[in-house]
Amino acid sequence: VSFLVKALAQVDYAAFFDHWLRVHVPNVKKTMEKVGGFRYVVSHSIDPEQEQYAGLAELYFHDASGWDEYRDTIEPDGMEAWVDGTGMLVLRGQTEMVGIP
């Protein structure tokens, strides 16, 4: 599952990225490990004030049931204070690992 993450207007990007890495990432990592997810990748924009999206998050599961269990298990951690949920794009897709491992 891939998320193009849109920040709320007038967000402090340094504080947002700090929260994302220090609070949200450990929460997602713990939940991924609990439900059998096998990869989690976060990319932050190098120029978020000029980009449409502040970052990208990729969560990898062996099958769709992992995503279902993740959604049922993840605990709120304040990320909603930073993210424009209506502007975020979510792609639930089948992944093929190709290229450089």
Stretches found by the model and what they are:
Residues 1-101:
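Macromolecular interaction modules
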